[in-house]
A protein has these predicted regions:
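Short, surface-exposed loop/turn microsegments at beta-strand edges and helix-strand junctions
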Residues: 69-78, 98-99, 117-128, 137-138
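A short glycine-rich beta-alpha junction/loop motif
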Residues: 110, 124-131, 164-190
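Hydrophobic beta-strand signal
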Residues: 106-107
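Sequence-specific dsDNA recognition surfaces
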Residues: 39, 56-102
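Non-catalytic DNA-recognition/assembly elements of restriction-modification systems
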Residues: 37-66, 190, 213
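Short beta-strand/turn micro-motifs at beta-sheet edges
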Residues: 30-31, 118-119, 164-170
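Short, charged beta-turn/beta-strand-edge "cap" motif at the junction between a beta-strand
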Residues: 111-115
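Amphipathic alpha-helical coiled-coil/heptad-repeat segments
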Residues: 1-33, 183-236
């Protein structure tokens, strides 16, 4: 029962984190500011001083094919863009991956990989199923990284996809670039990014602590069962 209770707390905090991100990137940090209709279904109301523009105003496609022998293989995951495990086999069929430069944003184009995206901290290569974007000078990459991680953006992104099977839709850049996104004043974009970096780190630390508690309890439970089964501890 205690493990189930802690698990429920973790889920509640995950939901809270998600709502904190969505609120900050779509409505800002100041609840008292006047709002206006954005005219965009997935956004709804936005602060009066914010604008809206297409993604293409802030990102351009990087579409250079390379080999993972020349550029270390990276994986685009829900946790961001990470070095691929050494156990994953290297390919032998030439330039069959996409180049990623440090600071690029990558997102998996397939709907069954929903939420897999992030800014790369590395130069490397990713599989062709990913869209790799180079931020333009006027893009605050960290703010948009938070925006692109929201459920609302994921819904909109995959809505622009094509496919026969619902859970295997693929969204191409020629459609993604048309998606309209919020544009807060540049200094506010930085404030939002900094706030979310700090706030989400705090939430994640609590979640990690609770997960550690579950592991400790599970381990204790297993050791008790082992002792009873082996007769080292008597019932009653």
């Amino acid at each position: 029962a205690l493990i189930a209770y802690i698990q429920q707390e973790i889920e509640t905090r995950e939901q809270y984190k998600s709502s904190v991100i969505t609120e900050a990137v779509t409505r800002g940090l100041y609840p008292s500011v006047p709002m206006k209709e954005s005219g965009i279904d997935w956004l709804g109301e936005i602060p009066m001083l914010w604008e809206t523009k297409r993604i293409a105003a802030f990102y351009q496609l990087r579409n250079e094919k390379v080999s993972d022998k020349d550029f270390p293989p990276l994986s685009v995951t829900k946790q961001g863009v990470l070095p691929q495990l050494e156990t994953v086999a290297k390919t032998d069929d030439g330039d069959n991956r996409k180049l990623v430069r440090k600071g690029d944003f990558a997102i998996n184009s397939r709907s069954d990989r929903r939420g897999s995206c992030g800014i790369s901290d590395y130069d490397g290569s990713v599989s062709l199923i990913n869209i790799v974007l180079k931020p333009r000078d006027k893009a605050n990459n960290k703010y948009y990284n938070w925006l692109f991680h929201t459920e609302q953006f994921a819904d909109e992104f995959y809505k622009w996809g094509n496919g026969i099977v619902d859970d295997l839709w693929t969204t191409r850049w020629q459609n993604m670039k048309k998606i309209i996104i919020p544009v807060p004043p540049i200094e506010e974009q930085q404030q939002i990014a900094d706030y979310l970096d700090k706030k989400c780190k705090e939430i994640e630390e609590i979640i990690a602590d609770r997960q550690s508690q579950i592991e400790t309890l599970e381990s204790y439970k297993k050791s008790l069962i082992y002792e009873y089964v082996t007769g080292k501890k008597e019932v009653g």
